């Protein structure tokens, strides 16, 4: 109940924005719109002005100029997200839904709007001749291919400007300049430390901006691959597999293994099985990384998929333990079939909800010899 989500319009000097729940803050109340967004201009002694109503809970507001703004809403139970184009000038134009999707469906993610800094030092959506621009991570069933897309705000027509074609490297687009048709991008591979480049999309010419060296050369030649496998109910799973330093793949010596994972809840099996791992990502150890164990003779399965799915009215946690054990068994089976792991010497590790996962796996299965619940 009441006003919430107070913020400032980034395209104006002093305009306050806030949200009011139209269902009294109770999701059980059935209403056509859950939230309404208002604005109040300085000196804040006038009547607030309604900007739009949203079907779900407002999650984000993005501003371009006096006549163009974007709102995003979400509803957790259905995982639905709507992206609205609206006119914040008080023209009375009805907000238009330009994207309506499952926010866990990474394959349909339209990306984020390209922004620049305005006279107030705030980031606003770039508009060029009635077009906005989107930068997407570009996950597909065939791999990750980041993209730039032009969106005509009048017709909603989308035009692909650029799609990454790298197959041996990972590309991450950091920024796009529509006027110059240039991107700032980062390139990396398992052994190539990430560096930044400026690229003209018309000519394709790359200009390297940074020249960082790999500080982790002791593990740069460690074998790394993204493996894909299935759970016993057919859901697609994946994980990033590392073999120990100096391991001879031809010998198929069975080694101890540690699995790092974090359970994720889904409402349908198709999104649960989507792959968001890129085999070309640089191997970057940090203080909590499991990758260090490759220097101690361990096989490491990092970021192993652990989906917990609840379809329809079923909640994911209704079958939490069964699905947890199914995920773990599928991961061990997959690496065992490759000939690398001693099944009697497998450990599992996780942080927070992942630590809860570890406790349940050690309590309700006999798959693991040890666990780290961080």
Segments from the language model and where they lie:
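Conserved beta-propeller blade repeats
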Residues: 1-19, 23-26, 35, 46-88, ...
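Short glycine-rich, flexible loops that bind phosphorylated cofactors or substrates
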Residues: 25, 110, 141, 192, ...
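Serine-hydrolase catalytic core recognition
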Residues: 31, 62, 72, 174-374
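Short acidic/polar mixed-charge low-complexity motifs
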Residues: 44-47, 57, 79, 91-94, ...
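Beta-propeller blade signature
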Residues: 31-45, 83-92, 147-156, 198-201
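Short secondary-structure junction motifs
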Residues: 46, 78-80, 143-145, 193, ...
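Long, heptad-repeat coiled-coil alpha-helices that serve as cytosolic signaling/dimerization stalks
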Residues: 143-148, 347-349
């Amino acid at each position: 109940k009441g006003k919430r989500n107070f913020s400032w319009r980034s395209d104006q000097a002093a305009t306050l924005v806030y949200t009011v729940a139209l269902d009294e803050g109770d999701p059980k109340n059935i209403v056509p719109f859950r939230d309404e967004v208002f604005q109040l201009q300085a000196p804040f002694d006038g009547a607030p002005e309604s900007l739009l109503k949203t079907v779900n809970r407002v999650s984000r507001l993005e501003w371009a100029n006096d006549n163009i703004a974007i709102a995003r809403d979400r509803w957790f139970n259905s995982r639905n997200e709507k992206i609205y184009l609206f006119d914040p000038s008080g023209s009375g134009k009805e907000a238009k839904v330009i994207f309506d999707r499952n926010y866990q469906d990474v394959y349909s993610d339209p990306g984020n709007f390209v922004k620049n800094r305005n006279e107030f030092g705030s980031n606003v959506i770039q508009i060029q001749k009635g077009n906005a621009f989107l930068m997407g991570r570009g996950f597909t069933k065939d791999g990750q291919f980041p993209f730039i897309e032009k969106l005509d705000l009048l017709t909603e027509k989308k035009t692909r400007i650029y799609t990454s074609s790298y197959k041996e490297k990972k590309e991450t687009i950091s920024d796009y300049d529509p006027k110059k048709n240039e991107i700032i991008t980062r390139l990396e591979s398992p052994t190539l430390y990430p560096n930044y480049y400026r690229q003209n999309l018309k000519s394709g010419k790359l200009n390297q901006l940074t020249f960082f060296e790999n500080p982790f050369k002791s593990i740069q030649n460690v074998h790394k691959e993204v493996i894909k496998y299935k759970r016993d109910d057919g859901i697609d799973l994946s994980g990033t597999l590392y073999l120990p330093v100096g391991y001879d793949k031809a010998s198929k010596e069975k080694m101890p293994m540690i699995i790092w994972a974090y359970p994720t809840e889904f409402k349908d099996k198709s999104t649960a099985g989507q792959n968001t791992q890129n085999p070309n990502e640089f191997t970057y150890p940090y203080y909590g990384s499991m990758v260090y164990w490759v220097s101690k003779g361990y096989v490491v399965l990092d970021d192993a998929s652990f989906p917990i799915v609840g379809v329809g009215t079923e909640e994911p946690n209704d079958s939490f333990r069964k699905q947890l054990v199914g995920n773990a068994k599928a991961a061990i089976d997959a690496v065992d079939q490759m000939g690398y792991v001693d099944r009697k010497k497998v450990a599992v590790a996780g942080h927070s909800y992942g630590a809860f996962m570890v406790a349940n796996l050690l309590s309700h299965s006999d798959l693991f010899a040890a666990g780290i619940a961080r």
